[in-house]
């Protein structure tokens, strides 16, 4: 079983990318569970046809400790198993703790079955605080992909996430598998992301072009592969799935200093001197 965490800044398209990637892996015959670790609890919406899934934390609040697995785990598109950890009530508690509670509960209830090829954790990545780092800190996820674009804030976040990975890689087995570019159609985007990934000692594993098909599929509450498996964008996600499945380049990243990051951004025209 490969346990994979997908990180990236809020709004970058992590959840969309994760759900389309897992649909691509399903097309390859893989058995998958997706665990949403974002308080927005939208990590599995497309796989479940738009059903707002009841989160682990909401279920715990309503039902107490006697929770059954089938009340927090739902099967979505292609039999992909879906769980949302959820978040605390706004202004109370810590969302990171919710992730810890959820993963522990899934383990107790026997969700990690032997037939699983992949478990994906879709994690909010602007803050690499202790709780959000849980999937990598506790040795749950062994490989990490960061979703980024050619925008400055996405790269700042990706560099920060790399610092978190570096910290926990020394004590555990977690490694960076690569950067996934979710294109924003920024000038020199491919070249910038490729240079950024290489600077970290990693790779740009796939460049996902921007496409109106993604929005169309989302309006229909589906992944692109389910909505129109014949379109070019569906093939992009299948290609991403093939690359992730075949990936063998796992590194402890070498995060950049602020100065070096800004140099790269200037080199590719994102920051004017």
Curated annotation (Swiss-Prot):
Its EC number is 1.18.6.1. Keywords: 4Fe-4S, ADP-ribosylation, ATP-binding, Iron, Iron-sulfur, Metal-binding, Nitrogen fixation, Nucleotide-binding, Oxidoreductase. The reversible ADP-ribosylation of Arg-97 inactivates the nitrogenase reductase and regulates nitrogenase activity. Its cofactor is [4Fe-4S] cluster. Belongs to the NifH/BchL/ChlL family. InterPro entries: NifH/chlL_CS, NifH/frxC, Nitrogenase_Fe_NifH, P-loop_NTPase. One of its GO terms (biological process) is nitrogen fixation. It comes from Clostridium pasteurianum. HAMAP family: NifH. The lineage of its organism: Bacteria, Bacillati, Bacillota, Clostridia, Eubacteriales. It is an enzyme of class 1 (oxidoreductase). ATP binds at residues 8-15. It comes from the Bacteria. This is Nitrogenase iron protein 1. The key enzymatic reactions in nitrogen fixation are catalyzed by the nitrogenase complex, which has 2 components: the iron protein and the molybdenum-iron protein. Pfam families: Fer4_NifH.
């Amino acid at each position: 079983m490969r346990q994979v965490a997908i990180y990236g800044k809020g709004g970058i398209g992590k959840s969309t990318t994760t759900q389309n990637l897992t649909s691509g892996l399903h097309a390859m015959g893989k058995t998958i569970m997706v665990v949403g670790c974002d308080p927005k609890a939208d990590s599995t919406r497309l796989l479940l046809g738009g059903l707002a899934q009841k989160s682990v934390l909401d279920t715990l609040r309503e039902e107490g400790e006697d929770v059954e697995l089938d009340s927090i785990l739902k099967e979505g598109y292609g039999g992909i198993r879906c769980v949302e950890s959820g978040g605390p009530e706004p202004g109370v508690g810590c969302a990171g703790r919710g992730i810890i509670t959820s993963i522990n509960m899934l383990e107790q209830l026997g969700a990690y079955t032997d037939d699983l090829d992949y478990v994906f954790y879709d994690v909010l990545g602007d803050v690499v605080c202790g709780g959000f780092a849980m999937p990598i800190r506790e040795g749950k996820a062994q490989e990490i992909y960061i979703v980024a674009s050619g925008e400055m804030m996405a790269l700042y976040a990706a560099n920060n996430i790399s610092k978190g990975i570096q910290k926990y890689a020394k004590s555990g087995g977690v490694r960076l598998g690569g950067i996934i570019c979710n294109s924003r159609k920024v000038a020199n985007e491919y070249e910038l992301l490729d240079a950024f990934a290489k600077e970290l000692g990693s790779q740009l594993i796939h460049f996902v072009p921007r496409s109106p098909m993604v929005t169309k599929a989302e309006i229909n509450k589906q992944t692109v592969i389910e909505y129109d498996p014949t379109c070019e964008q569906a093939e992009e996600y299948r290609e991403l799935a093939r690359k992730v499945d075949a990936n063998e380049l796992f590194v402890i990243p070498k995060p950049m200093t602020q100065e070096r990051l800004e140099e790269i951004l200037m080199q590719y025209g994102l920051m004017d001197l």
